[in-house]
Amino acid sequence: MAPLFILTETAAGLVLFKADKKLLKKDDVASEIETAEGINGLLKLKQFQKFDSAATALEEVASLVEGKVSPMLAKLLDTLKDEKKASLAVADPKLGQAINKLPGLTLTPISDSKTNDIFRGIRDHLPSLIPGLLPEHISTMSLGLSHSLSRHKLKFSPDKVDTMIVQAISLLDDLDKELNTYAMRVKEWYGWHFPEMGKIVNDNLAYARVILKVGMRVNTSSTDLADILPEEIEAAIKAAAEVSMGTEITEEDLDNIKLLAEQVVGFTEYRQQLSSYLSARMQAIAPNLTELVGELVGARLIAHAGSLMNLAKSPASTIQILGAEKALFRALKTKHDTPKYGLIYHASLVGQATGKNKGKIARMLAAKAAIGLRVDALSDWSAQGEGKGDDVDDEERSALGVTSRAKIERHLRGIEGKPLLPRGVAVGPNGKTTSAPGKWEVKEARKYNADADGLAGDEPAAAIPVREKKNKKLIEEVAEKSDSDSSDESDASEKKSKKGDKEAKKAEKAAKKAEKAAKKAAKAAKKAVKEAKEVKKSAVNDTPEVNGKKRKSEDDGEKSEKKKKKKNKD
């Protein structure tokens, strides 16, 4: 009968048991392994390979959890190469598939419900199955290994790595604000003592280092500043110190200024270190996004979204306006045009575009960034688990970002009709390079110019020649005449316009009266026609009764006519 081997991992090492294959065909396996005597009768210890240290135990167990075959496990399984038609019971089906791919092994991995019952019994009665292993030692080693394994999982969690980028970019922004404030305070404070140095040295770090090395202004000529400044700058500072117009300060003032200068130097060095750290982390976590928009813009996008996965789930339209939420909601509320870009506006490709092309390039860049983000967040770059080789190199990981950036640059070059600037060059809003002020700028100190004075000594001041006044004719009378004429003309024109308005109103009233008279004449003609018709009808009727009735109707008609006339008069 073919044997059955059972592979078990413990906190102390890897264990290989041997049993009869009929064990899997029994229906009451769980009841037989409930006691230590029963499980010892079914299983025999084949081999026990201990872990050398806690680090080795963590490495081996971590590989088993991920379903990988470690070198130590491969060495243990080499002892079973001579076994024919044997089976190997494992707890993880993924691990069984990895073992089945090993060359030279004819074992058949098994993982089902019955093997789970066997592993449960082994864990319960492990001290009785392995001689020399105490229960206290097993519990202590299991506790330490579980803590180490938990730390290992948290350390390599991609969600936790995003936190490093979010905190780093936030700290970088805070450092920039603090450095700007401290550097301005140092220049204003030390400027009372040596104001000319602020115009010569523009770099904040060099300014603070000069203060720490020189101290009082009188020590400038005897201090060597070659390790901080170039020769021409050093010479300019020493020349300006000799004729400086600054006030004197005490040693206590200088001590406080030096303490602040030390803060500027320390923060500047830490800021450089943090910037390099952020660039390295962005290249490792989101290489395609970094190639498209840069380290700082990419880090701000991740920080604004909360994590790399949240940003990868966002569509391109959201990535395009991320950071401009206030402007978006204000535009929707007022029914105006929505913004075209948010944080992505600071990318170099968008900065090189001009006018309406900025919106087009921002839309293209957001679309490519959305694809690159999904590749960065969801791709499994490591191929070791599949047995295909080592990790993918950085160039292959960022290949999508490089090709996408080249496509956008080609499109931008076509619509702009000009060559693009190389990467790393600061670009202003107009698409041109922003010429930052140089670190070293030589400016001559201003000296007193005696030639500019009007008097060289005690010479009396020259009298200013008085110019003769020319008699000019008065033009007041002419102005008055012209004013009166113009006023008379304006009055006459106003009177004429008023007369014309009155005549027009009179003509309108006469026309209205004529219309009313015509209407009255038409009504009178209609009445006369009606009366003539009534007279004809009365002449036709000859009977007295009819004449009497007709008479009454005529009297009634006369009364009605009188009433109508009264109404018309009223």
Swiss-Prot record:
It is found in: Nucleus, Nucleolus. PROSITE patterns: NOP (PS51358). InterPro entries: Nop56/Nop58, NOP58/56_N, Nop_C, Nop_dom, Nop_dom_sf, NOSIC. Residues 475-484, 492-518, 528-539 have a biased composition (Basic and acidic residues). The lineage of its organism: Eukaryota, Fungi, Dikarya, Ascomycota, Pezizomycotina. Gene3D superfamilies: 1.10.287.4070, Nop domain (1.10.246.90). Belongs to the NOP5/NOP56 family. Residues 451-470, 475-570 are annotated as: Disordered. Keywords: Nucleus, Ribonucleoprotein, Ribosome biogenesis, rRNA processing. It comes from Sclerotinia sclerotiorum (strain ATCC 18683 / 1980 / Ss-1). This is Nucleolar protein 58. It comes from the Eukaryota. GO terms for cellular component: box C/D methylation guide snoRNP complex; nucleolus; small-subunit processome. The gene is NOP58. Its main location: nucleus. The keyword Electron transport does not apply. Residues 285-417 form the Nop domain. Coiled coil: none annotated. One of its GO terms (molecular function) is snRNA binding. GO terms for biological process: box C/D sno(s)RNA 3'-end processing; endonucleolytic cleavage in 5'-ETS of tricistronic rRNA transcript (SSU-rRNA, 5.8S rRNA, LSU-rRNA); endonucleolytic cleavage in ITS1 to separate SSU-rRNA from 5.8S rRNA and LSU-rRNA from tricistronic rRNA transcript (SSU-rRNA, 5.8S rRNA, LSU-rRNA); endonucleolytic cleavage to generate mature 5'-end of SSU-rRNA from (SSU-rRNA, 5.8S rRNA, LSU-rRNA); protein localization to nucleolus; snoRNA guided rRNA 2'-O-methylation. Pfam families: Nop (PF01798), NOP5NT (PF08156). Required for pre-18S rRNA processing. May bind microtubules.
